[in-house]
Amino acid sequence: MAKRSSLTRRGVSPRAAARARRHMRVRKKVRGTPERPRLVVTRSLKHIVAQIVDDTKGHTLVSASTLEASIRGEEGRKTEKSHLVGKVLAERAKAAGITAVVFDRAGYRYHGRVAALANGAREGGLEF
């Protein structure tokens, strides 16, 4: 029998395991500081969540999601809502005094909803 990785166990698809490996590889290099916190994106089939995290303290400073009532009520496709999440996140970050972030795509491809969120955050005034 072939040896299994700790990430390829029953119930986890090979695609999800590969994404988790990519995310771990990126997290070794990407660190958020108080001056330049980490913007991490989490995606599901229906929703997207973005958080700005200070890794030195382990605290979430600002977050935005399509699960919020104000964004959930908006009309449009998932990609358009992701763009809106990026803009809302940028507004909240500016209010908290955050202007520059390190983008952590969490192993997802920089395409579609992830790219739309990043573009929305840039339009809102965040610097990557």
UniProtKB/Swiss-Prot annotation:
List GO terms (cellular component aspect): cytosolic large ribosomal subunit
Identify the keywords attached in UniProt to this record, alphabetized.
Ribonucleoprotein, Ribosomal protein, RNA-binding, rRNA-binding
* Span list, region Disordered: 1-36
- The organism's superkingdom is given as Bacteria
Annotated Basic residues bias: 18-31
User: Which Gene3D superfamilies would you find in this protein's record?
Assistant: 3.30.420.100
Q: Does the keyword Transmembrane apply?
A: no
GO biological process assignments: translation
Q: Which molecular function terms from Gene Ontology are attached? A: 5S rRNA binding; structural constituent of ribosome
| Pfam families tied to this protein | Ribosomal_L18p (PF00861)
Biological role? This is one of the proteins that bind and probably mediate the attachment of the 5S RNA into the large ribosomal subunit, where it forms part of the central protuberance.
UniProt similarity note = Belongs to the universal ribosomal protein uL18 family.
Give the NCBIfam families listed for this entry: L18_bact
Q: How does it assemble?
A: Part of the 50S ribosomal subunit; part of the 5S rRNA/L5/L18/L25 subcomplex. Contacts the 5S and 23S rRNAs.
Instruction: Identify this protein by name.
Output: Large ribosomal subunit protein uL18
Q: Which organism is it from?
A: Thermobifida fusca (strain YX)
